[in-house]
């Protein structure tokens, strides 16, 4: 069995904020596989089987505790199903990666992401996989806490939709083929807009006609 946790905050006012991109990804996975969300203590969960029959059992999780207490939702599920850290994937926003980047990482510190921080605290280990989706550092003058709770801009919508689609693809690969395959296939993902090519110098055609003195 695999546990896939999408980090975010409950409430419609947070649904389209940067901090909730993990929820968007697990919602897309649930939609693809026809899984239905239902409440389970401090979380909403959706169960599915992925891959060829009978398939790998997967429990998608959206903590309902607010970000900073995500471990309160994850810990009891982790214990109930007697899981090892290798069976857990946390889908999170990442301030340290530019918007448009997506990558897997195994273990390591929380990097200031308070949902990951609390999961590490509750589980007592860092040794679980994360799927990190870049939201970029805040612009000058922004507090990071305000930035992660800000809404996506209209001009970001197309890239966001593609990131969510690829994020769901990445979750499916992790479940079916493991972390190494996920890293190989997705850690080079870069959806940042490419700058227009620099204009090339104009080359004037040589004048083949006769030259006359003025």
UniProtKB/Swiss-Prot annotation:
Molecular function terms from GO? peptidyl-tRNA hydrolase activity; tRNA binding
- PROSITE patterns, per this entry? PEPT_TRNA_HYDROL_1 (PS01195)
Give the main location: cytoplasm
Q: Which reaction does it catalyse?
A: an N-acyl-L-alpha-aminoacyl-tRNA + H2O = an N-acyl-L-amino acid + a tRNA + H(+)
**For the site Stabilizes the basic form of H active site to accept a proton, which positions are given?**
93
Swiss-Prot/TrEMBL keywords: Cytoplasm, Hydrolase, RNA-binding, tRNA-binding
Question: Among the record's GO biological process terms, what is one?
Answer: rescue of stalled ribosome
Enumerate the Pfam families for this protein. Answer: Pept_tRNA_hydro (PF01195)
Residues annotated to bind tRNA: 14, 66, 68, 114
Its transmembrane ranges are none
User: What are its E.C. numbers?
Assistant: 3.1.1.29
This entry carries the following GO cellular component terms, namely: cytoplasm
Outline what the protein does: Hydrolyzes ribosome-free peptidyl-tRNAs (with 1 or more amino acids incorporated), which drop off the ribosome during protein synthesis, or as a result of ribosome stalling. Catalyzes the release of premature peptidyl moieties from peptidyl-tRNA molecules trapped in stalled 50S ribosomal subunits, and thus maintains levels of free tRNAs and 50S ribosomes.
Mind telling me which NCBIfam families this protein's record contains?
A: pth (TIGR00447)
Question: PANTHER family, per this entry?
Answer: PEPTIDYL-TRNA HYDROLASE
State the HAMAP family in the record: Pept_tRNA_hydro_bact (MF_00083)
Q: How does it assemble?
A: Monomer.
Family assignment?
Belongs to the PTH family.
| Name of the protein this chain belongs to | Peptidyl-tRNA hydrolase
Gene behind the chain? pth
